[in-house]
């Protein structure tokens, strides 16, 4: 399997990576060497005979190399396949910029294989250049100049390469509203100047196939007429997609492919087609008919990502020749489209030849190393060691700038498989160049153990040995094929080793031997696996102070629960069986109002730690025990002579006590003062009752009634006196006013009410005579 050694740099990187990954081996239910190798890059398998003891699982054979060596497995018995890379050069000759041309990888899951790819930029590499021009009306001056540039463009290419070809295509936009005016007259002549001869709008027209004939270029371009549309953005991405998707129609060779995109405005992209009721996404296929993109009104514009993928797939490098106001817009576009460049185009395109030369030099001096699409099970990273001293590590693609002619640069490619893969291959290429590296990937998952299949005695003659373990014949099972199934299926035997249908065989911690679980021995010190289904062990219990069940001195673990030794208790035997910390000064546990657990009181509701003596939030007992105080001291009240039964928790004291002072009314309405001193326990008090009661005499009913009647009468008399006084004052005031008016009046002999019956009238004419 091994051929040429991989380069030293790749080998060093691979070994250093392997050292890191080999420090651990995470495994689960491993029963073969292949399953062990698939568990991780740090796992190795011991094929030594009798390496496992009675009850040991086969998974004991799978561990890190240091662990297996420590357990007595010889180095020759350890199976540890590694990922390898074999390189093969192409000896067919020809100018190759990438080497090697073929690499074969043998990949172990989780372990990378590394190899080097060298790129050497060649001088005079063949070039195909396709000039794609915007023919909207604003590009009128540019079209005039481009018609004269055929010879200049080809001469510029010949300065760079000995084999250059040029082609030409043009675009405007989709021929539906709102992109163009769909009035019949405007469709025939979309230009604002009616006297100007214009061609109808179109999405994309392939004018000239790639050729080295500059006269033909000049002739065909000279026939082109300007056109027009409505909105500012153009349908340039539509045209670029067709140029990339139609290699045969365009005439692309397998050489450096340049696409010059000349415009003075922006571009429509995916989703804009909805404005014209075009809902079908762009399919990225060639739809040229008679050199026209006639189905442009059926498909939406392509997305930028879709176009970038198509350009990279066909190894086309776009050069955006745009006017000054659009430079920033297209610079943003080049960040998404790899291996692309932007040049500032003069208003009349007079500098296009110089622009193309500069852009080509910029593109060819930067190298991107990338690969085609891969399944999720393969991961590829690149380390770039550029000639200018710059290094990029662990990148999704290789990237070097400032690459000079005939100066080699190196990329280290690391490929990792996440699982055992099927045989497959992928291609690595330098974007914009035609050379490729074919990488064939093979799985490295099998163990090449010593062939002992003929020695059947080690398996009781009922099987053969494979990598240290027996593979039994039909009808026999067991570690050494010692168990005969006797017609029972393996499923039936395994069913006896399951707790229920949803559980795994022997809880995953034992082997099912002849229908019975043989529990594994554990690598963990002190762990014993047992039980009918190996469901129990001596370690999976609660811990205290970092030890199972508080340590051997406190208790032992039995099937998930701690059994504590005498003197200890608790779910993890964390508590000592003593109540010293719970005793009050009277040596009563938690004052009779709680429970002592782990030498700490757990008080009844409301009572406070540490000894459950106080209950700040509890209701006052005064009102509850007034009847008891009355019967204990005075032998009165509702309890009467049945006081001892009604008040069992109270004890009468003849001497004053300390505690809660109460003052309540008894059944006779007298105030009784007493003091309650709480004793140990619930509702237990020592009570001292004051002998004197404050009894209030009954009310004098006659005095109350007489006083009430007298008060009402007096109030009535007082109101009458006040009313009479007010009437008198009002009459007095009226009389005095009458007296004043009488003094002011003057009387004569004439009756002021009499009117004379005689009326005298003077004749005015009498005086004139």
Swiss-Prot record:
Gene Ontology BP, a term: phagocytosis, engulfment
Binding positions for Ca(2+) 2 per the UniProt entry: 173, 229, 231, 233-234
Tissues expressing this chain: Leukocytes. Expressed in neutrophils (at protein level).
Record key words, sorted: Calcium, Cell adhesion, Cell membrane, Disease variant, Disulfide bond, EGF-like domain, Glycoprotein, Integrin, Magnesium, Membrane, Metal-binding, Phagocytosis, Phosphoprotein, Pyrrolidone carboxylic acid, Receptor, Repeat, Signal, Transmembrane, Transmembrane helix
Residues the record marks as carrying a glycan: 50, 116, 212, 254, 501, 642
GO MF term list: amyloid-beta binding; cell adhesion molecule binding; complement component C3b binding; heat shock protein binding; ICAM-3 receptor activity; integrin binding; metal ion binding; protein kinase binding
GO cellular component, as recorded: cell surface; external side of plasma membrane; extracellular exosome; extracellular vesicle; ficolin-1-rich granule membrane; focal adhesion; integrin alphaL-beta2 complex; integrin alphaM-beta2 complex
Residue span of motif Cell attachment site: 397-399
Post-translational modification Pyrrolidone carboxylic acid, affected residues: 23
Keyword Transport among record annotations: no
Pfam families: EGF_integrin (PF23105), Integrin_b_cyt (PF08725), Integrin_B_tail (PF07965), Integrin_beta (PF00362), PSI_integrin (PF17205)
Domain VWFA: 124-363
Residues that hold Ca(2+) 1 according to the record: 138, 141-142, 264, 347
Illness association: Leukocyte adhesion deficiency 1: LAD1 patients have recurrent bacterial infections and their leukocytes are deficient in a wide range of adhesion-dependent functions.
Binding partners and assembly: Heterodimer of an alpha and a beta subunit. The ITGB2 beta subunit associates with the ITGAL, ITGAM, ITGAX or ITGAD alpha subunits. Found in a complex with CD177 and ITGAM/CD11b. Interacts with FGR. Interacts with COPS5 and RANBP9. Interacts with FLNA (via filamin repeats 4, 9, 12, 17, 19, 21, and 23). Interacts with THBD.
Name of protein: Integrin beta-2
Lineage of the species this protein comes from: Eukaryota, Metazoa, Chordata, Craniata, Vertebrata
